[in-house]
Amino acid sequence: MDDDAIEIPITDTLDLHPFRPAEVRDVAREYLLEAHARGFTQVRLIHGRGIGVQREGIRALLSSLEIVIDFHDADASGGGWGSTVVLLAEPKE
């Protein structure tokens, strides 16, 4: 087991701010796969506003995952363009 492994609670929101930029895509991928396996059909990834590097990396990841049906900016109360709402496919039984 990796000594650096961090257990992330699986809720409908993942804040990516605590993670190093090099970890963000892997963390998001693992989170999305686990959220999907647990039956979540909508989640929110908080990547921040900044200059958009993390946002674009997250969106490239989302485009590559078969479990992702769609994604879009959150509404203003959910973080606006600093967060991405992700619609996930129903898990297969």
Q: Each PLM stretch: what is its role?
A:
Residues 1-93:
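Long, charged, low-complexity intrinsically disordered regions
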